[in-house]
Amino acid sequence: DCCAALKFVWDNHASLHIDPHKIAVGGDSAGGCLAAVCAQWSRDHAHIPLCFQMLIYPVTDVRMMTPSMKKYKDSPFWNAGLNKKMWDIYLRNYPGKCPPYASPMQAEDLSDLPDAYIETEEFDCLRDEGILYAKKLCEADIQVQENRVKGTFHGFDFFDHAAIAEEMISIRINALKKAFK
C-alpha cells in the first residue's frame, strides 16, 4: 500500500501540485520500516527520485538479535515481545521466510537511496538496529543525519509537549526543510 501510494503521488505530481524533486518518505517505528523498504522498492522498480527518508526509531531487522533487543524484552510502551508479535503479523503470509522489501537490513544493496535522518532512542529495543541501519547506509555512501537521543524511549514523542519531544520535532522539521531546499 505504501509503495502504491508513493507511485500514485509520483504519477500524479503535476495534478497534485507537488514538485517531483521534493518527494520524501518517512515514518516512525513500523512506519519507519515501511518508509525504508519503500525507498528501496522505489529505487529498484519505480525509479522515483526520492529526495529524503525520515526514519524515527525504525524497525529495520526481522532477526531481532541486537543487544538492545535482548535488553528491552519487557519494557513498557514497546519491547522485544511486542516487536516479535508485530513481525509475526506482518509476515503471517510468508511462513519461514522474509520476503524482499520487508526487512530493510536484509537488503544486499543500499546504494543510490535518498539521504536519511535516522533517530534512535536510548531506552528502546529498536535502538541498535536503527544505529546499524544508519551505519549500513553510510557504508553505501548515503548521507545520514543520525540522532541518538539520550533519556528517551520508543514513542516518547507521543508526549508532544515535553521539552525533549518539542526539541526532537524541531530537529526533524529542520532536517525536512534542508532536504526540500
Residue ranges, per PLM feature:
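Alpha/beta-hydrolase superfamily serine-hydrolase fold, recognizing
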Residues: 1-181
